[in-house]
A protein has these predicted regions:
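An N-cap/entry alpha-helix motif that binds or orients negatively charged groups
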Residues: 7-44
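Catalytic cores of alpha/beta
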Residues: 140-147, 203-217, 279-290
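Glycine-rich, proline-tolerant flexible connector loops at the mouths of alpha/beta enzymes
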Residues: 47-50, 96-109, 165-167, 231-242, ...
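Canonical Radical SAM [4Fe-4S] cluster-binding loop centered on the CxxxCxxC motif
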Residues: 40-80
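Conserved strand-turn element in the central/C-terminal portion of the radical SAM core barrel
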Residues: 103-106, 130-135, 183-209, 227-235, ...
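Core AdoMet radical
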Residues: 67-82, 88-110, 115-184, 193-200, ...
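Auxiliary Fe-S-binding modules of radical SAM enzymes
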Residues: 1-21, 89, 218, 224-345
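Conserved, mostly hydrophobic/aromatic
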Residues: 32, 60, 98, 157, ...
Length: 345
């Protein structure tokens, strides 16, 4: 397949995803990088990642912190989380992401509300204050409104698969595709920059499924997307089922390809170079940036807790060295929220 033959409809996207030709993949990534620079610029925006808790009420079949898995649970105190946010401010990251297992208990909800207000009050020495993205799963509309009013302005809720049948294969029966979709539309309606994403190269997934994921992002009009390669956790039901999935090399290539295709499909959105890329390649996130991504999320969670937030069998625990990226030519957007151009239209 040649780049000149690429079309951005379902058939063309699926053909590009299925194509394993190295020359095509290289040309695609180079074109996506060119489009990125021309539309959103060369700047890389930083989101300091705070993994606030690995306690989760959900039981997703692929996840290493699912409710029924045996692991050492933790929850950062408000003081620990706030201290970590101050580290982000000191490093001029511009924004933080508060990510954790899904919980809907009142104590946790109130804690996040208090934490948001405290983070927004941090004196960064710059204007604006720290931006805050939340990634805390499905909540009621009322909770989303409470957190928005407390200072969160971006929310990442991954659909994981836009195919309802595939969604049901990787989630227990008490998980609802329709409920997740409604949560996304609630977030958008409230005023969040509502981001989503899916796993890439998981069991049962076809090239057409991945093409549909890309088209789902466009139909939803997502201002930001965080997607990454499927990385199996050895103790999850999906891994233990023995269902086949692509090799690590192929999943990595697919991850870069999906970033590149999405950049061509939605030129002015924010696209994250996911941590999952770096699990498969030491330079994974850098290669993601060169494929069209423009956001990275250095992990600033205290290390003694970071090791417990084991979504998958990850080989890397350290945050991306931002200075190292700079030394190799990346332009870092220090002190900036880096909101999606698409959202600001």
């Amino acid at each position: 397949m040649k780049l000149s033959e690429l079309t951005l409809d379902r058939e063309g996207l699926a053909a590009a995803i299925a194509c394993g030709d190295a020359a095509f993949e290289t040309a695609l990534r180079e074109e996506a990088y060119r489009v990125k620079v021309a539309t959103v610029g060369a700047e890389v925006y930083l989101r300091g990642l705070i993994e606030i808790s690995n306690i989760c009420a959900k039981n997703c079949l692929y996840c290493g912190i699912r409710r029924d898995i045996r692991c050492q649970r933790y929850e950062l105190s408000e003081e620990e989380a706030l201290a970590t946010a101050r580290i982000a401010a000191k490093r001029r990251f511009g924004s933080v992401v508060i990510q954790g297992g899904e919980r809907t208990d009142a104590a946790f909800i109130r804690k996040i509300t208090r934490l948001l207000k405290a983070i927004k009050a941090i004196d960064t020495g710059e204007d604006p204050p720290l931006g805050v993205t939340l990634s805390l799963g499905e909540q009621s509309r009322e909770v989303y409104e409470e957190w928005f009013d407390a200072g969160a302005h971006r929310y990442l809720l991954r659909i994981e698969s836009s195919n309802p049948d595939l969604y049901r294969k990787i989630h227990p029966a008490d998980h609802s595709y329709d409920r997740r979709l409604q949560a996304l539309y609630d977030l958008k309606d409230i005023g969040y920059q509502a981001g989503t994403g899916a796993m890439i190269g998981m069991p049962f997934q076809t090239a057409e499924d991945m093409a549909d994921d890309l088209l789902f992002y466009k139909k939803f009009d997502a201002p930001m997307v965080g997607m990454g390669p499927y990385n199996p956790h050895p103790e999850t039901p999906l891994t233990l089922s023995g269902a086949p999935y692509p090799s690590a090399e192929r999943r990595f290539a697919l991850g870069l390809k999906m970033i590149a295709l999405l950049r061509l499909l939605m030129p002015d959105i924010n696209i994250a170079a996911a941590t999952a890329l770096e699990v498969l390649d030491p330079l994974g996130r850098e290669k993601g940036l060169l494929s069209g991504a423009n956001v990275i999320m250095p992990n600033i969670t205290p290390e003694e807790q970071m090791v417990k937030y084991n979504l998958y069998d990850r080989k890397t625990l350290n945050a991306t060295d931002v200075q190292d990226l700079e030394s190799r030519g990346a332009v870092i957007g220090y002190g900036r929220w880096g909101d999606s151009k698409h959202f600001r239209k």
